[in-house]
C-alpha cells in the first residue's frame, strides 16, 4: 500500500507513487501548477524532493504555500518543490492524488516495489513519430538485458504503443 504524506498534523493518501525523470512532463502532457518539476540535478543527486498532486496539496496545505515545506512520506523527509496542475478525473484515473520523486530517490526509498508485483511504467515520446518502432525495439532490448530475460524466453514485461492503446480502447468501447 502507498504510505501517507504528512505535514504538521495533516495527512493525505496518495494513490500512486511515480519515480520520474525530467522528461516525464513532456511524455505525459502534464504541467506543474506551482513551483518546479524534478530536474536532472535532482535525479543525479537522488535529491530528497517531492512534487505532489493537486489533491495532496489541497489536503495537507489548505492555507499554506507548500513550496519549500518538508513532508514525511514513507519514513523519509522530502522538500516539496512543486505541485502539479489540477487535472481532474478522466475516464481512466485522476492523477491529482499522485506524488512524484526523482527516479533514483524512488529506487532507494521503495526498492520493494517491483519485487511485490507492482507495475513499473516507462513513458517516452519520440521526437519523430516515425521512429516509434525503433524506440520500442531499443527499449525492449534494454529491458530484456536489465531484467535478465534469456534469449529464448518471452518478455516478462509489456510495451504499450499508441496503436495498441487505441486498439484496446476500441475493443472495450466497441468503437
Task: List the model feature ranges, each with a label.
Residues 1-2, 118:
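Membrane-proximal extracellular/periplasmic loop immediately following the first transmembrane helix
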Residues 2, 56, 164-165:
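Alpha-helix capping/helix-boundary segments
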Residues 130, 143-175:
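Membrane-helix entry/capping segments
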Residues 10-13, 44-45:
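A short, glycine/Asx- and small/polar-enriched loop/turn
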Residues 13-15, 157:
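Short active-site oxyanion
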Residues 18, 22-42, 46-152:
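Mid-to-C-terminal secondary-structure elements
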Amino acid at each position: 500500500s502507498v504510505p501517507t504524506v504528512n505535514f504538521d498534523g495533516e495527512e493525505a493518501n496518495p494513490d500512486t507513487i511515480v519515480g520520474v525523470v525530467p522528461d516525464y512532463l513532456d511524455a505525459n502532457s502534464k504541467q506543474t501548477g506551482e513551483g518546479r518539476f524534478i530536474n536532472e540535478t535532482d535525479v543525479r543527486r537522488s535529491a530528497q524532493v517531492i512534487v505532489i498532486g493537486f489533491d495532496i496539496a489541497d489536503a495537507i496545505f489548505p492555507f499554506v504555500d507548500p513550496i519549500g515545506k518538508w513532508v514525511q512520506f514513507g519514513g523519509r523527509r522530502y522538500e516539496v518543490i512543486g505541485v502539479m496542475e489540477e487535472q481532474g478525473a478522466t475516464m481512466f484515473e485522476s492523477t491529482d492524488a499522485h506524488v512524484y520523486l526523482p527516479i533514483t530517490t524512488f529506487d532507494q526509498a521503495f526498492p520493494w516495489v517491483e519485487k511485490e508485483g507492482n507495475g513499473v511504467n516507462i513513458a517516452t515520446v519520440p521526437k519523430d513519430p516515425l521512429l516509434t518502432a525503433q524506440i520500442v525495439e531499443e527499449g525492449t532490448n534494454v529491458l530484456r538485458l536489465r531484467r535478465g530475460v534469456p534469449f529464448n524466453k518471452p518478455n516478462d514485461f509489456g510495451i504499450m504503443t499508441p496503436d495498441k492503446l487505441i486498439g484496446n480502447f476500441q475493443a472495450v468501447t466497441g468503437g
